[in-house]
């Protein structure tokens, strides 16, 4: 480490704004020269493993590793009209790092959450079309929704749980009957619409990884118009397999 820059202004310490000033006189020739000197198999970053099964170790990941990964993931985004993303998982982990590169590659505007405690507020504020999470975050979100449903008047509660049961039957791999589609449309109008509003009313995709997601939870989100894509991998594979 040669230099440390603070975000906020601190007397006697270099500030982040100085980096902007350093980049003002752009030398296009120098930029192209540096770009051309980078090879696909050069190390782009070193990311440490989580240490779940063994002592954490630094993994050398190349430019080729990341590019092959986010180009594959891009096929999902190409099918959707998504232009904003919310990031809140640690960027020192390969999961969020790779998805951040994916957002940038596809020209998305990336917002960074203030904290996990303010995640709900930030979702409603920036209205992202996509975010990635671990199952525990989705489970806590689902639990909050359930708690609100439990505290509703009797008739509303009956409709709420009817919509949940309907959602748990959803299967996007199968053709849905017209009767189920009609009930699902009704459930969306009465229940799921409010869920989406609580998540910013623009969310289309949630990427889940790091652990197994409960199938009934994923089905319910899909039924509510929010597609949940699950992936698995390892730091060494940068990370999606």
Whereabouts are the PLM-identified features?
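Structural core segment of the AMP-binding/adenylate-forming
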Residues: 1-22
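Conserved pre-ATP/AMP-binding loop-to-beta segment of ANL
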Residues: 6, 24-48, 55, 78-84
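Conserved S/T- and glycine-rich ATP-binding loop of Class I adenylate-forming
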Residues: 43, 49-52, 85, 90, ...
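Conserved AMP-binding/adenylation subdomain of ANL enzymes
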Residues: 67-84, 91-192, 202, 227
């Amino acid at each position: 480490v040669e230099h440390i820059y603070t975000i906020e202004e601190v007397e006697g310490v270099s500030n982040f704004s100085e980096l902007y000033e350093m980049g003002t006189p752009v030398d296009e020739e120098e930029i192209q020269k540096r770009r051309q000197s980078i090879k696909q198999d050069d190390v782009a970053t070193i990311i440490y493993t989580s240490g779940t099964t063994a002592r954490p170790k630094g993994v050398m990941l190349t430019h080729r590793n990341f590019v092959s990964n986010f180009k594959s993931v891009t096929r999902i985004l190409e099918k959707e009209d998504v232009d904003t993303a919310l990031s809140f998982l640690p960027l020192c982990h390969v999961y969020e790092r790779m998805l951040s590169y994916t957002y940038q590659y596809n020209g998305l505007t990336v917002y960074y959450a203030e904290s996990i405690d303010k995640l709900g507020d930030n979702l409603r504020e920036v209205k992202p079309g996509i975010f990635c999470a671990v199952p525990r975050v989705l489970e806590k979100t689902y639990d909050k929704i359930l708690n609100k449903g439990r505290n509703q008047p009797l008739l509303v509660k009956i409709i709420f749980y009817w919509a949940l049961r309907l959602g748990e039957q959803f299967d996007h791999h199968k053709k849905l009957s017209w009767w189920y589609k009609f009930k699902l449309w009704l459930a969306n109008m009465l229940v799921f619409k409010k869920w989406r509003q609580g998540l910013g009313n623009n969310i289309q995709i949630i990427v889940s990884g790091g652990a197994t997601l409960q199938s009934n939870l994923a089905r319910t989100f899909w039924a509510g118009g929010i597609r949940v894509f699950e992936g698995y991998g390892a730091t060494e594979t940068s990370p999606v397999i």
